[in-house]
Each structure stands twice: as C-alpha cells, then as structure tokens.
Amino acid sequence: VKTLTGKTITLEVESSDTIDNVKAKIQDKEGIPPDQQRLIFAGKQLEDGRTLADYNIQKESTLHLVLRLRGGMQIFVKTLTGKTITLEVESSDTIDNVKAKIQDKEGIPPDQQRLIFAGKQLEDGRTLADYNIQKESTLHLVLRLRGGMQIFVKTLTGKTITLEVESSDTIDNVKAKIQDKEGIPPDQQRLIFAGKQLEDGRTLADYNIQKESTLHLVLRLRGGMQIFVKTLTGKTITLEVESSDTIDNVKAKIQDKEGIPPDQQRLIFAGKQLEDGRTLADYNIQKESTLHLVLRLRGGMQIFVKTLTGKTITLEVESSDTIDNVKAKIQDKEGIPPDQQRLIFAGKQLEDGRTLADYNIQKESTLHLVLRLRGGF
C-alpha cells in the first residue's frame, strides 16, 4: 500500500479479505482510522463491502492510500424517472468514482451512465472539485443505451413512466416492460400513439415511434368482446374490441386485417354512419353486433340502385362514369347482364353513352333498375 507521502506498507492478506479488513490492517500498522482511508487500485476507489478478489487484486499488487479529510459530503443524483439517489462523496472523487457508486446502489453499468451538472455532461477523468460540485448539489443521470432509446408512457392518472427500448422492440415487449415497472398485466394494457391503438405484434419502428416519444396507456377492462364487420362483397371480418374503443380504433383494426386505409372506410350500424371520435359504447354496439363497411372512394361517391324486388344495391362511382360503366358494376354485384338492365332516374331512362354528370346524378342518389325481358323491344 503506497501512501501520498511515498511510504510503502506491506500487508499479509487473503483474496477473500474485504476492503474493510484491509483498512483495519492499515489501522493496526499506521494508526489511521478506516473512515479516513480511501484505497485506490487501477484508478478505482475500492468500496468497503467488496473483496480483493472482486477487484482482481493479486499478490504483490500495489494499492494507493489517500486520506479522506474528515467530512466528505453528500450529493444527490436524480434519474429521469424522478428517483433521487443520495451518495457519500469527496470533492476529490472522479466522475468514474461517482459512476461506480451509482452502479453499487442501482446496478447501472458506468458505460450506460451520463451525468449532467449545470447543463454540462461530466467527463470521467475529472473530479467533482473540477466542476465546482459542492455538498448537496444535484446531478442528473441520463441513461445511454447501447443502440437504444428512451420513451415515455403517460397513464390516465397523469403519471409518466420512462422506458428503455429499442426501435425493434414489439408492442408486446413494451407491455412486458410496463408490467415489470408497474405490475399491470399486458392483457389489461392498451397503448395509444398519435391517436392509434398499437397492435401487439408490430414494432415501435412500424409506428415511427422515436426517442422521447410519449405513448398513452389506457387500462383495458377485463372482458373485451367480438364484433363483426360485413363488407359490400359479403365478406365478414371478426374484430376483438372494447366498448371504450373509438371508431378510429376500429378502422385501424380493419386496416391491419384488410389493408383498407381508414379514410376510405365508412362504418354503418343500425342505419347510422359512425363518427370517428365516438366510442362503440356511445352507439350501444355490444358483443357480436354486426357493422357494415362501405368504401369511400377518393373523389368518388356512392349511389344506390333499387330493384323492383325492393332490394337496394350500393355502388361506388365517379360522376364521369357512363351508364355502361354503372351497368357493368351492377353485373359484377348481381350477375345481371347489362343488356337486360334498364336504369331509371327522376322518371327518365338513362342512355348508355351518357355520364352520371350528364343526368345530374349526385352522391347518394337512388336509381331504379328494371329488368328488360329477353326478346322484348
């Protein structure tokens, strides 16, 4: 053990001796109380409870003894989660030493720690004195993730949770991290970002969630439900939903299943078109209810065609569509050949080469379809 005066003390030790034991041996030899001793090896201050083996101190190693002026000081370290750690330090401690103390208390490896004081990031080799850090100063600890990032999760109670994540983490992974921190089972968590409910199998990158983004956590009452969505082609989609889901959420689920952008979806229930900001509960949509999905064409419109049997067909059309085009769409839906179709609007039979615009047929107009018997004239 080498002192600052240059004197070297020789000690007989075991690898299993703790730093406390070593300080007691130095007290026996030199009369220096352990609480005034700081031992340094390989640039690191040695912590009392650790053993020589922990620091890989082998035979004939040299430790450096620095006297601790009575009266170290306390400083505080505040993390992004709002937790405050209290540390016992000396002005002569290096930033490395401080990070080692934080590791001992919190288990965070020094290479993942960034310490900030007065807006400056602190460099490892410098001392607290170099930065004029005095007793009861507060440092801020920011985690440096290997290739990772931090995001925030805000709960309905207003509490904000900080999570360490990677862009490649799935929403399932994020829910598991929230469970670790908050104890909320993943199946009760709904995460919302940019107004969209996040689906389990997708990644943060899929939703363009970047560092320091804020997600919103909504608790899912146990017991979601299934509803059905019927498309104009007759296909039925089954969705897992909550009563508290908004119509936007439902459209996002339909997009995930069918690839149809929400802005092209119109949902109808009990004859009413559903508005995006409202919830299923607002419309009294219960388990196993069936919604109807109508596609809203960009720049297009819907018209209705009523048959003599009273059936109404919905068509997606453009004003520039010709009557021929419309008959072809009816054939696609109903299988009726165009040459057997007669279309009537406002009491007039529509001629094939003309357009809907020519007849001032606008969105949600109703045409009447009369069948022309073969061999008629």
Curated annotation (Swiss-Prot):
CDD domains linked:
Ubl_ubiquitin
Q: Propeptide residues?
A: 377
Report a single Gene Ontology molecular function: mRNA binding
| Chief localisation class | cytoplasm
Classification lineage:
Eukaryota, Viridiplantae, Streptophyta, Embryophyta, Tracheophyta
Keyword match Ubl conjugation: yes
Q: Which organism is it from?
A: Nicotiana sylvestris
Q: Which domain of life is it from?
A: Eukaryota
Name of the protein this chain belongs to: Polyubiquitin
Family, similarity comment:
Belongs to the ubiquitin family.
Q: Which Pfam families match?
A: ubiquitin (PF00240)
> What GO cellular-component annotations does this UniProt entry give?
cytoplasm; nucleus
Question: Where does this protein reside within or beyond the cell?
Answer: Cytoplasm; Nucleus
Identify the coding gene.
UBI4
Q: Which InterPro entries match?
A: Ubiquitin-like_dom, Ubiquitin-like_domsf, Ubiquitin_CS, Ubiquitin_dom, Ubiquitin_ubiquitin-like
Residues forming the Ubiquitin-like domain are 1-72, 73-148, 149-224, 225-300, 301-376
Function noted in UniProt:
Ubiquitin exists either covalently attached to another protein, or free (unanchored). When covalently bound, it is conjugated to target proteins via an isopeptide bond either as a monomer (monoubiquitin), a polymer linked via different Lys residues of the ubiquitin (polyubiquitin chains) or a linear polymer linked via the initiator Met of the ubiquitin (linear polyubiquitin chains).
Provide the cross-link position: Glycyl lysine isopeptide (Gly-Lys) (interchain with K-? in acceptor proteins). G148
Keyword terms, alphabetized: Cytoplasm, Isopeptide bond, Nucleus, Repeat, Ubl conjugation
Cross-link named Glycyl lysine isopeptide (Lys-Gly) (interchain with G-Cter in ubiquitin), where? K120
Note on file?
Answer: Ubiquitin is generally synthesized as a polyubiquitin precursor with tandem head to tail repeats. Often, there is one to three additional amino acids after the last repeat, removed in the mature protein. Alternatively, ubiquitin extension protein is synthesized as a single copy of ubiquitin fused to a ribosomal protein (either L40 or S27A) or to an ubiquitin-related protein (either RUB1 or RUB2). Following translation, extension protein is cleaved from ubiquitin. For the sake of clarity sequence features are annotated only for the first chain, and are not repeated for each of the following chains.
